[in-house]
Swiss-Prot record:
Keywords linked to the UniProt accession: ATP-binding, Endosome, Kinase, Membrane, Metal-binding, Nucleotide-binding, Phosphoprotein, Transferase, Zinc, Zinc-finger
Residues covered by the PIPK domain: 1473-1796
Positions with a binding annotation for Zn(2+) 1: C192, C195, C216, C219
Organism listed in the record: Drosophila melanogaster (Fruit fly)
Entry's Gene Ontology cellular component terms: endosome; endosome membrane; PAS complex; vesicle membrane
Disruption phenotype: Flies contain undetectable phosphatidylinositol 3,5-bisphosphate levels, show profound increases in cell and organ size, and die at the pupal stage. Mutant larvae contain highly enlarged multivesicular bodies and late endosomes that are inefficiently acidified. Even though endocytic receptor trafficking is impaired in fab1 mutants, Notch, Wingless, and Dpp signaling is unaffected.
Residues binding Zn(2+) 2, per UniProt: C208, C211, C238, C241
Protein name: Putative 1-phosphatidylinositol 3-phosphate 5-kinase
Length: 1809
């Protein structure tokens, strides 16, 4: 121990500079350091700190000055088995100087420390081999940034090549390595390599132990452990190399032990204080991993893995070396002979010890570790966590030496969240039974060969059609097909799929097409190897070398210190020749014949290599070098200076150069087992061969994919389709039932029996994409059949839509695989064309050259035959050019300074162009100008959009991928959020099926770092089109061979199973994306019947092999199951910009008849009671004229009531009547009865107080109903008639009525009748001429509010039926505020106020003297001053209890008010007041004009014919009841007058859009019911209109205060959306009102907002209120009653098992609308809004809308956000619901994007949107 420490101390003392060194842990060995060793190390550290020079290194100066090249035979220079010492090195430089021609360098072998020690027994041989193999390093893949000299890639490569493995026990001295030989000599360095400071006595020279350059003490003061290059002690390195070491350790942290991790932390702490201007910051590539790889699906998830990863190349290389060890081979054979096949680990150790194979147990374990690494021994139950030998495990001897690289991969585990499909019981059998069953099945299965031939035949037919299509698309001769098929089939069939790496799966990476113009097409051939355009660097170099040794250099061979850094010429002259001679010596130590360099080579180096007879090729493309590296299986050396291990050279059969018509090609042919091919294309021009190359590349891809795909189809026992499938096989959606599949197979027979009309319908809705290779031929066959005309007609005749896409699609092959059926784009289906969102997208949604070429290249008058010959610019090409000038054609012999030449040149310049002069573009006709503008637009369209019908754009599979841990009893969480992956077939995001199973499925005991739960509980889900594939794991108990992947499947419907067989080598290399594509679109495949069942006539499963079967892969004790399940895809329904109001359903006649019957009985009872009271009076005053006239008036009222009832009966029996007609008639009938009760009740009370003397002198006369009609008609002629309200919630008589017009009614207001009766009585008084006495009597008969009505009313007390009639009859209820709003909107006062506001608005733009404003009070007072408004029981005024002023006072007040209003801005609100004998109402309408304007654009009333009710009412008005009074009694006669007699004064119907929308809104608001809306926390009360169209929400005072400044901006935003036709999610507000109801003992005042009901007409099963927050957003449905509104967390929990998938176009519209609306709300400081979502499963629609968007971020909300965000109130650290508007907006957008997931389809990314 002491001697060793002293030796270490002596070797270390020259490796440190004085005081700038940082101490590191000196001992990195596994054994603990003794106390004496620690003391020695301490003394050594103190000594190192005081040592100031490291320039003189023992035995290094002399050797470093030597520049002779060296060569290592067989192994690396540092791990050679030769016993030659360093003293035996010959001085080649001296000998070369004395000879005429330089000779290749001699062989050099170096002995390592471990080899000099040796062992004394033969039993150590295996251990030595093991130790030696542990020291062997392989070169990693090259990087693209490699430069000569001390660059990032060079040093990284240097470190990665020499980094030590886990065995650190065998370290050596730095002097025993070859690094010191390649140091820069001291005599060649005059300044520091980094800072360029001159060396002097005080600035000494220091060599970096890694790069070998010379630095000053400041630039070389870092220390790294020598174990990174398997040296003992520490190494002194420059700052640059120290940082590179740190970067390397960080990039491979998973491979480090504890000591290495401590080193990394120590280096990080040291270097973090370095300035940002260091050389490391100048190389951003250092931040990347040194071994980049292609992105794949697995690569996205490798962060889940908790296992260390190892480089596959290093393991393979190590294993190959170990397998070549004779001692291990002999030991393996002896152990197989003497031991059983399976043994315990302890038994193997005992065997080695007992047979003298090892001296102790440690050596035995080392030998067994070597056997494990070589593949001679493997555990029975593989455990990826246990990489080394374990005596407690059981092992078996392996016959196969193939490397099992899967244990180094990152695992992924999932479990199915749904009911796990269980395999049939027959599958539970041992591996031996499966093997026997497989052999019997394959031997006896005579269907295997038949299936193969059928599959091949179908593909060949498909390939021919695909090739012909591509040749036509590229304007190529069809004769190319035979040539291309021969070339591609040779390459695809001979290339071995296992040669593909996971990063380069596409065969086109291994087969290159080279264009060689000239020759004949049949001269095209396949070269087994690589061919490219290049020549040798010098003509004296050999151009033909049989069996060459090829070296690939990525770095330049030049002297360049730092790229881009200035350097003095003295240093270059001093060091360049020495440096290049040293580099060439390193190159020649590898003995190459051909050297290819990616960059340039200095002239000195070229001469040196030429003198050694080396063929040099310069400036080779990196892609060519990579292809050579793959084909020849050699390394690309990134740096000669830092490469200390033996690089792997390339070997081939022949190297030669050929010249083809001036094009020089360089060939590297490898005839045996080539890993690459080159196809030489000949027989055309360069332009033609460019197009041929594209076609050939696509054909090669298709042929190679089918080779792998067919192999998998045979493994899964797939049954090929019938030879003649129907061309109408393509459904617009994926098949869902087996019945559809059966009908699909029989559809050709069905089509023959269908009529022509039926066939036309089928074809128009189902257009196949002709992916099936037999469909095109079937289409040609059907084109000649009798069914052809209707088919062609169905495809061609579609006037409303552009049919170019579907027509082109019907004759285009999109897939390289046969028998795949793709659904049409949703927006191109009939259902998609009719959806609401279709109008938001362009009419031509997809672009294709198939029709754009026609519009661009061919004029309208050009025939079809000339279409292919024309080109975009041929119109200009056909122009006649002017003759060329003489100067262009003359031969110039005189100098340019001569006068003749100058004069000719001047004349040529003034000559002008050769194109004929035409009109200026601005003066051309419009048609030509339009063509000039459109041409570049079409060309740019080809550049902007992808061709949707190009098969190359369909060689991908867009999927929605996610991974999550599903816990049905707890909380689930995403480990990988759903993300859209565009999986390119055999390219980006794709992975081999075998690699996918090995890396992410078949590994145990892996924990997810995201959720820290076992990966076995995780789910991996791939969603595409209308289905998804779940991948989940189970434990495989069959004990199958762990080196093979077994496959089986079983039907989930009938439990039919396929035999368990090993997956073939070709099937293992199938693309995962192609496998998933078959699961999504290959539903036509069925299970191939076994031969035994076919012979015995047994039943065969007819279910889809890819839709109904569960696929099971078993590997190393783990079973991976793939199950396809259909998904529910939703269409979104946003709030429409225009709300279409529907016409109510007609009443049920029987029910209404019963209601009318009951109502008529009640009315007759009322009139009978009045008759009885009058009859009682008549007994006392038998001959009283007053009694007679009372009877006449009662008869008149009864007649009017009877007319109203008859109108209702007539409407019920007329089919033309609408619900509006019936409802209006019922409302007027109720109003007539209510008016009679109000009049006759008080009147009968007063009759008892009158004497008969005051009435018996009235003479008898005649009274007719015409005289009883009012003289003044106050109803609006042009107004609409609406329905009245219902007495009961479900009363059908009160449903809204038709939107009709009405003239003057027979039943006018009660006051009008009183006025008419007063006139009648005044004209019939004969006895008493004193009218005052008569008026006094009638005044006493008027109803009084202080009296109690003796007549009992059949209507509820809170109903008010006798208010002044407006545009339509409205039934006002005290408890229903919506009826008060409806009455206010239809009242005459509201219309007058709107007109006044309009007049004021117009007056603002004109002179105030020209227009007089009519105040509301004035208009009301004028109305009240009329005789018809004299009754106090039906009074209207501007405010409750307002007194009626005199005309003079009102006029003066109105003038004063008008002057004040001119000064003040007009208020946008209108306040209306009205009352009757028992109640006062007031309604304030906010922003009346603005809401009217918005409603006129947003509400669309139903289109109705002329009201039938109005015609009937006019007809009844012409009926007169003539009543004759005589002493004997009354005589009545019904007389019908002509239509123009007695008709009311009407005006023509002027359609007013605002009024129509307002009346339509009032019809819905006339009746509402309470609605218990759940989910909100505001506590507001809600109501819904009876027709379910609108929602009324109560608003508090704070909401009203916020709404007033917000409303103008809201109107502007909605108007802009309507003008620009931009969809919005904001639920529209149709009015805000404040309603007050005042009675004697109560007063109610509420503010109400009227909004649209988002769920109108929808069958909503689930409702969600989403805010984007997950804090307290969970509802327990079990604890809720009634209507349940779920929240965010409920939706998240549902997304694990049943996410909300939406179509792609729906997600596009939804995302834009959310972004636009949330931005608008953010600008107005609005937050806390919600997205209301309803699931209409019946129609497959998500109904959405944003609600509660009034609340702003006020002070109280700020305080709430701060308190909840602090965590004082809990919340589990989640973001509070209420945050500032900017933050709320972003969170809302992100959450909605997560909640609604897009389901990609085949057409994802190909549309113009």
């Amino acid at each position: 121990m002491t001697s060793n420490n002293q030796n270490n101390s002596s070797s270390h003392q020259h490796l440190h500079s004085p005081s700038k060194l940082t101490e590191f842990a000196r001992n990195f060995e596994d054994k603990p350091e003794s106390l004496f060793g620690r003391v020695v190390n301490k003394i050594q550290n103190v000594y190192n700190q005081s040592y100031n020079t490291v320039n003189d290194i023992s035995s290094g100066s002399s050797s470093s000055s030597s520049t002779q090249p060296v060569q290592v035979v067989g192994k690396s220079q540092f791990f050679s088995d030769s016993q030659t010492s360093t003293a035996e090195i010959a001085d080649v430089e001296t000998s070369s100087q004395s000879s005429v021609r330089p000779q290749p360098p001699t062989t050099l072998s170096i002995r390592t420390n471990s080899e000099t020690r040796g062992t004394s027994t033969s039993s150590n041989t295996a251990a030595e081999d093991s130790e030696t193999s542990d020291r062997v390093e392989t070169l990693p893949l090259p990087t693209s940034e490699a430069n000569q000299g001390r660059t990032v890639s060079n040093v990284l490569k240097h470190i990665s090549n020499i980094v030590a493995t886990k065995n650190n026990n065998d370290l050596r001295n730095y002097k025993d390595t070859e690094l010191q030989r390649f140091w820069m000599p001291d005599s060649k360095a005059k300044e520091c390599y980094d800072c360029s400071q001159k060396f002097s006595t005080f600035r000494r020279k220091h060599h970096c132990r890694l790069c070998g350059q010379i630095f000053c003490s400041k630039c070389c003061n870092q220390v790294v452990p020598g174990m990174i290059i398997r040296c003992d002690g520490d190494l002194k390195v420059c700052n640059y190399c120290s940082k590179i070491v740190l970067t390397f350790l960080k990039s491979s942290s998973s491979e480090m032990g504890q000591d290495m991790q401590e080193l990394q932390q120590h280096l990080s702490n040291k270097l973090e204080v370095q300035d940002s201007g260091s050389s490391l910051a100048k190389h951003p590539q250092m931040q990347r991993a040194p071994l980049p790889r292609k992105t794949s699906v697995g690569y996205q998830e490798e962060r889940f893995s908790s296992h260390p990863t190892y480089t596959t190349l290093s393991i393979d290389d190590r294993k190959n070396i170990l397998q070549q060890s004779n001692s291990l081979i002999t030991l393996h054979e002896e152990m197989q002979r003497d031991l059983p096949a399976q043994n315990c680990g302890q038994r193997l150790i005992e065997f080695l010890n007992s047979n003298n194979k090892s001296a102790n147990e440690v050596q035995a374990v080392a030998i067994l570790n070597a056997m494990l690494a070589a593949g001679f021994l493997e555990p029975i139950v593989p455990d990826p966590e246990q990489m080394d030998f374990d005596s407690s495990l059981h092992y078996k001897f392996s016959k196969s030496s193939s490397s099992d690289t899967s244990r180094t991969m990152s695992p992924q585990f999932e479990a199915n969240p749904h009911a796990e499909p269980q395999p049939p019981k027959s599958m539970d059998q041992s591996a031996e039974e499966k093997e026997k069953e497989l052999e019997n099945e394959l031997e006896n299965d005579r269907c295997y060969t038949t299936a193969t031939s059928k599959l091949l035949a179908s593909y060949c037919e498909h390939e021919e059609q695909l090739l012909a299509q591509m040749l036509r698309a590229h304007n190529l001769d069809q004769e190319w097909d035979k040539v291309l098929q021969m070339l591609c089939s040779t390459a695809a069939n001979h290339f071995k799929p296992e040669h593909c790496s996971n990063d380069l799966m596409d065969i086109r990476n291994y087969v290159n097409f080279k264009k060689v113009p000239g020759g004949r097409r049949k001269d095209s051939k396949i070269v087994h190897g690589v061919a490219f355009s290049k020549n040798v660097a010098h003509k004296d170099m050999a151009t033909h070398v049989p069996f060459p040794r090829i070296l690939l250099l990525q770095c330049p061979i030049v002297y360049e210190r730092i790229e881009g850094k200035f350097v003095t010429i003295e240093t270059v002259l001093l060091q360049e020749k020495e440096y290049l001679r040293n580099v060439c010596a390193r190159i020649m130590s590898f003995k190459p014949n051909v050297v290819l360099v990616h960059k340039n080579v200095a002239g000195i180096a070229q001469d040196l290599l030429r003198s050694y007879e080396v063929t040099l090729v310069l400036d080779v493309k990196l892609s060519v070098m990579e292809r050579l590296s793959r084909t020849l299986q050699c390394d690309i050396v990134s740096s000669i200076e830092s490469n200390i291990t033996m690089p792997k050279l390339g070997y081939c059969n022949d190297f030669y150069i050929r010249n083809y018509n001036g094009k020089t090609l360089m060939f590297f042919e490898k005839l045996t087992n080539p890993r690459g091919y080159t196809c030489l294309l000949r027989g055309g021009s360069n332009a033609e061969l460019t197009r041929v190359k594209r076609v050939a590349s696509a054909l090669l891809f298709a042929r190679y994919n089918w080779r792998l795909e067919m192999s998998f189809l045979l493994n899964e026992f797939a049954q090929p389709l019938s030879p003649k499938p129907s061309i109408f096989d393509s459904k617009e959606t994926s098949p869902k039932t087996e019945t559809e599949a059966e009908l699909r197979s029989k559809r050709p027979i069905i089509l023959e029996r269908k009529s022509e009309d039926k066939i036309t319908t089928i074809v128009s809705e189902n257009v196949s994409d002709f992916t099936d290779p037999l469909r095109a031929s079937q289409a040609e066959a059907l084109s000649t059949s009798p069914c052809a005309p209707p088919v062609v007609e169905a495809l061609a005749v579609e006037p409303r839509y552009d049919n170019r896409f579907r027509t082109a699609l019907s004759s285009t092959l999109l897939s390289v695989s046969p028998f795949l059926t793709f659904p049409l784009p949703y927006l191109e289906t009939e259902q998609g064309r009719k959806c609401k969102l279709r109008k938001l997208f362009p009419a031509e949604l997809y672009f294709s050259k198939q029709w754009s070429r026609t519009g661009l290249e061919r004029p309208d008058s050009m025939g079809d035959g000339e279409a292919g010959k024309s080109e975009p610019g041929n119109k200009e090409n056909q122009m006649q050019l002017l003759p060329a000038h003489d100067f262009v054609l003359m031969k110039i012999t005189a100098p340019a300074s001569s006068r003749d030449i100058q004069s000719k040149l001047a004349e040529f310049r003034s000559f002008g162009g050769r194109l004929p002069k035409g009109k200026a573009p601005m003066l051309r006709p419009k048609k030509k100008n339009a063509e000039v503008i459109q041409r570049p637009q079409k060309v740019s369209e080809e550049q902007l959009y992808k061709d949707a019908l190009d098969p190359q754009n369909h060689q991908r599979l867009p999927v929605l991928f996610c991974s999550f841990h599903y816990n049905p009893k707890g909380v689930s969480s995403f480990c990988k959020l759903p993300m859209l992956l565009d999986m390119k077939f055999y390219g980006q995001y794709d992975i081999m099926l075998e690699q996918f199973l090995q890396r992410y499925c078949c590994l145990f005991n892996s924990m997810c770092p995201s959720c820290n739960l076992p990966m076995l509980g995780h789910v991996r889900r791939y969603v595409h089109s209308l289905g998804c594939v779940h991948v989940y794991l189970t434990e495989d108990l069959t004990r199958s061979d762990p080196t093979r992947i077994y496959f089986t499947s079983w039907c989930s419907i009938c439990n039919a199973t396929t035999p368990t067989i090993p997956l073939s080598d070709a099937a293992k290399c199938l693309s995962l994306a192609k496998y998933l594509e078959m699961r999504f679109h290959g539903h036509a495949y069925k299970r191939r019947p076994p031969s035994t069942d076919a012979e015995q006539g047994g039943t065969v499963c007819e279910h889809s092999l890819h839709r109904d079967y569960v696929h099971h892969f078993s590997f190393r004790g783990v079973g991976a199951k793939f199950q396809y399940t259909p998904v529910e895809v939703w269409e979104t329904d946003l709030p429409s910009l225009t709300v279409q109001l529907d016409l109510p359903q007609p009443f049920q006649s029987a029910q209404v008849q019963e209601e009318i019957k009951n109502f008529s009985i009640k009315g007759h009872e009322v009139y009978n009671r009045i008759h009885e009271r009058i009859a009682d009076l008549a007994t006392e005053e038998e001959n009283s004229p007053l009694v007679q006239h009372l009877k006449t008036m009662l008869t008149h009222d009864q007649f009017i009531f009877k007319q109203k009832i008859e109108i209702v009966h007539t409407l019920l029996t007329d089919n033309r009547a609408t619900a509006y007609d019936t409802s209006d008639a019922l409302a007027m009938a109720r109003r007539a009865l209510a008016e009679s009760i109000e009049l006759w009740g008080p009147r009968l009370q007063e009759i008892e107080k009158l004497t008969a003397k005051q009435a018996h002198h009235i003479d008898s006369g005649t009274i007719c109903t015409e005289e009883l009609r009012p003289e003044q008609v106050q109803t609006a002629d042009s107004s609409k008639v609406t329905t009245s309200s219902l007495p009961k919630e479900n009363d059908p008589l009160e449903c809204p009525s038709e939107d009709t017009e009405t003239g003057a009614s027979n039943s006018q207001t009660v006051l009008d009748k009183n006025f008419s009766i007063d006139q009648m009585l005044a004209s019939t008084v004969n006895v008493y001429s004193d009218k005052k006495s008569i008026r006094k009597i009638l005044t006493q008969l008027l109803p009084s509010g202080n009296q109690v009505n003796p007549l009992q009313s059949p209507f509820p007390a809170q109903d008010h039926l006798t208010l002044p009639l407006g545009s339509i009859p409205i039934h006002v209820r005290e408890t229903d505020l919506s009826s008060v709003i409806a009455y206010s909107l239809t009242s005459m006062d509201y219309q007058k106020a709107i007109d006044e506001a309009e007049a004021n608005s117009n007056a603002a733009h004109s002179s105030p003297q020209l227009k007089r404003k009519i105040p509301l009070a004035e208009s009301v007072s004028d109305a009240e001053d009329s005789p018809s408004l004299s009754r106090t029981s039906s009074n209207t005024s501007a405010a409750p209890n307002a007194s009626v002023p005199s005309p003079a006072t009102a006029a003066s007040e109105s003038e004063e008010k008008s002057k004040e209003r001119i000064k003040q801005p007009p208020s946008p609100h209108i306040t209306l007041a009205f009352q009757d004998h028992s109640c006062q109402f007031q309604c304030k309408i906010y922003f009346a004009r603005e809401f009217d304007a918005m409603r006129s654009k947003s509400l669309k009333p139903p289109k109705l014919d002329k009201s039938l009710y109005r015609r009937l009412e006019k007809s009844k008005m012409r009926e007169e009841l003539r009543i004759s009074q005589s002493r004997t009694g009354s005589e009545m006669e019904l007389v019908r007058k002509p239509s123009d007699v007695g008709a009311p004064r009407t005006t023509e119907d002027d359609s007013n859009q605002e009024e129509d929308a307002r009346i339509a809104l009032a019809r819905s608001l006339c009746k509402s019911v309470q609605w218990e809306a759940r989910g909100g926390k505001s506590g507001s009360r809600f109501c819904k209109t009876l027709d379910d169209r609108f929602v009324l929400k109560e608003m508090n005072s704070r909401d009203m205060t916020i709404f007033e400044p917000f409303a103008p901006k809201y109107f502007e935003y909605i108007d802009r959306c309507q003008q620009q036709q931009q969809p919005t999610l904001l639920a529209k507000i149709f009015g805000v009102f404040r309603v007050s109801v005042k009675k004697k003992d109560s007063f109610v005042e509420r503010s109400v907002m009227v909004m649209e009901n988002l769920f109108y007409g929808c069958n909503i099963e689930n409702k969600f209120d989403l805010k984007g927050s997950e804090r307290n957003r969970l509802v327990d449905p079990s604890n809720q009653q009634g209507e349940i509104v779920l929240l965010d967390e409920n939706l998240v929990q549902m997304s694990w098992s049943k996410p909300l998938y939406v179509l792609s176009h729906s997600k596009t519209v939804l995302r834009d609308a959310i972004q636009r609306d949330s931005s608008f709300l953010e600008k107005n400081l609005v937050m806390d809004y919600s997205l209301l979502v309803g699931l209409d499963k019946k129609n497959g629609v998500l109904v959405l809308g944003i609600i509660d968007y009034i609340r702003t971020f006020t002070l109280d909300k700020r305080v709430e956000s701060i308190i909840k965000g602090s965590g004082i109130l809990g919340g589990k650290g989640k973001d509070p619901t209420v945050v500032n508007p900017e933050r709320y907006k972003q969170r809302f957008i992100d959450a909605m994007d997560r909640y609604f997931l897009t389901v990609p389809d085949r057409w994802e990314g190909l549309s113009k949107v």
